Amino acid sequence: MSGKAVELKGQLPPLPTLASTPEEAAARKLAQEERDAAVRGVVSIGAMREAVKRHARSLPLLTEIPRIKRLDAQGFAARAAQGLPFLMTGLVERWPLCSLTPRDLRERHGAMPVRARVGDYIRQPFRANRPMRDMLLAEYLDLEPGRIHGPGEPPPYVGNMELRELNRLCHWPAYFGKMGPPRYWLGPVGTMTPLHCDFDDNLFAQIWGAKRIFLVPPHHDAFLYPNEANPVLFGSPFDPEQPDFDAYPLARQARPVEVIVKPGDLLYVPAGWYHQVRALEFSLSSNRWARGLPLALQNDLALRRP
């Protein structure tokens, strides 16, 4: 390993390791479920997941994602309690980060270390040992199309990264009592996160460029052939953009809804909603996950830890 690679490695979080035995994998899973439940203040992650899907069965079927003006905290809580996604305008566009260009980002923050997803990360999106490449942000922004990815592979993608230098340039609304740190998603047209769901409420801010997002309600998971990546993250092999109903016949019963997010948009994705995200242009996005009982379940006292 080169000196530069060692230096970058020390500035980035360690890569996850695979369990060496089934027993170790089971023990890790149990410990992770307990940690996740404690952080969210719920009696059980499994019970929370089932409650999310149960609530979703009572919701109307969406044919489009509502676009509304920004809400104050009280208005957001009331709307989000329905358990349906919606998009807000008039908030993110005021962030200082939105005024920066890619050139500005390179000049001011190019020395930040980043970790890019490389190879065919779309087919193996949530595998713990999927290929990654560490580099400086400036190096990533300077990449030429096709330089480090092969034919048929998507472009390298800086996804789900903590870029702490950028946090002061984003003014997140105080919609939740507790939230995880901001995560950043940077990449050219064609970068993608395949269909999956997080069992945490999610705020997704679009900084630059446009992205196409498909959303599917939580209770349609029975049609999506889900795979558990961790207790609060499930992936699906089904692609709503290019549906293969021969391989996934049950997916005919799923009802995805599409939305295009543009610079300045803030999308609320309720816990448990499946979503697939593809960049239509060179894009920068940021998101934060809430760390608590989903707003749609606030009145379900049986889920709260004593």
Q: Model-found features: residue ranges?
A:
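N-terminal accessory scaffold of Fe(II)-dependent oxygenases
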Residues: M1-L266, Y274-P306
